[in-house]
Amino acid sequence: MRRVKRIVQYPYGRMAMESGVGVTVVVMDTGMALHPELYGQAVMFLDLINGRNDFYDDNGHGTHVCGIIAGRQIGMAPNAKLIVLKVLDETGNGNVVYSMRGFRWILENQEKYNIRIVNISMGMKAGTNILGEKRILKGAEMLWDMGIVVVTAAGNLGPRDGSITIPGVSKKVITVGASDNMHSGRGSWQKAIYKPELVAPGSNIFSCNSDYANGKLYIGKSGTSMATPIVSGAAALLLSKEPNLTNDSVKRRLQNCCTDLHMSKSRQGSGLINIRKLLQY
């Protein structure tokens, strides 16, 4: 994560002192293992697949994502709090029913836990389940309409245009591509899908290993799933500094404070997230 923080111009020292204080981020994923970086970082774990009460991650994807957002040492916003909803199984696959249960739980508990951000490092390929796609889109947009910052992955079906996954195609949510991955999902300007909003590093990102007991605390993973929590963490930094911002304001600020990579808009959106610029704006 040190490499990532250099790339996105993470501000050490005074500008990052708050580092997510007062912000709760929901992670909808495969779960979270109690990795040393994540002790005390989660205020709630809800297993919507197997109904278990203990923290666990039978895939590793969710633990990795959680570490990027709020790992004690490596996280983008180490003072943010996490709520982890397990909506993906041990293979990393999901079911529309579990995701919809997650969306409903968030809406019902938004005020209780001061939920400001939802990280969705998953997606459905467009055209595979039309009814399911509509439900997922509606669920994500309901969160946005309630003032929550919804940050979702662009998917890894690129480089062809129009390869953004669901719910990333929504005009409301913040869709994140990977700046250094040719397979990052692309928008389609011909179809007026002006996506992604921005990009972040997504190749060989080192974060928490769910199988840390084997002595390997960190593991590298790649994809827009890894780029997305970088942006969620940045949003937590911003909301910690300026808690009265609306989700629309957060979206505009993120896009206005990017570094242009001189790539096509369908690949980079507004550009590479620049956190120093974001917090100095």
Give the residues covered by each predicted segment.
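Extracytoplasmic/secreted envelope proteins and their assembly/folding machinery
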Residues: G62, C66, M100-F103, L137, ...
